[in-house]
Design a protein with these regions (language model features):
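Conserved acid/base catalytic micro-environments in cytosolic active-site loops
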Residues: 1-187
Length: 187
């Protein structure tokens, strides 16, 4: 049974995240943690916009916060977000990974170690290589992996890089990702 969804996005990610979050039903009782490479001054505006489009609570993650259902956590600007063994969030200012902090790989890897087969990892649009290695780690630990179709993504580099590293479980258009999450969570 799926207990957590983790998502990574960069260039074009605001639109992509808005599309799939808006389609998640209130009945879906899971948490979502997102790393989005975004400018520091935009996160507050984004969170309030997304809160009006989804039935989930959308918020900036806090240190030692328990991961709770029906909540979407965003990594704060300039902090890596990590999943701890006790299923809480920790924040770190460790060195950048793939030129990024927050790093998608850091989130994906720590979530894979804790949630294993109870995890869905989703890599969306983006113009760097962050997220591919972490998504592979999710697959190695038995989690499900979804990559936005590089052919239709706003920026294809991140999803394409993942498909060259390994074979994700699903490569699908952004409009169909929420439906796939629902399907996997009800199996």
């Amino acid at each position: 049974m799926i207990k957590l969804v983790v998502v990574g996005a960069s260039s074009g990610g605001i639109e992509a995240i808005s599309i799939f979050l808006a389609k998640l039903p209130v009945s879906l009782n899971i948490p979502v943690i997102i790393v989005l490479h975004i400018g520091n001054n935009k996160i507050g505006t984004l969170l309030s916009q997304l809160n009006s489009k989804t039935s989930f609570l959308v918020k900036e993650a806090e240190e030692q916060e328990t991961i709770s259902p029906k909540t979407v956590y965003f990594a704060p600007p300039n902090y890596h977000i990590q999943v701890e063994d006790n299923r809480t969030i920790s924040l770190s200012t460790d060195a950048k990974v793939n030129f990024s902090r927050p790093s998608i790989d850091v989130l994906f890897e720590t979530a894979a170690w804790v949630y294993k087969y109870e995890l869905i990892g989703i890599l969306l649009t983006g113009s760097n290589n962050d997220g591919s290695k972490g998504l592979l780690e999710i697959k190695k630990h038995g989690g499900k992996t979804i990559v936005e179709n590089p052919k239709t993504a706003y920026s294809k580099t991140m999803p394409y890089t993942a498909t060259t590293l390994f074979e994700p479980d699903y490569i699908i258009n952004i409009e169909d990702i929420a439906e796939k999450i629902i399907e996997l969570c009800t199996e």
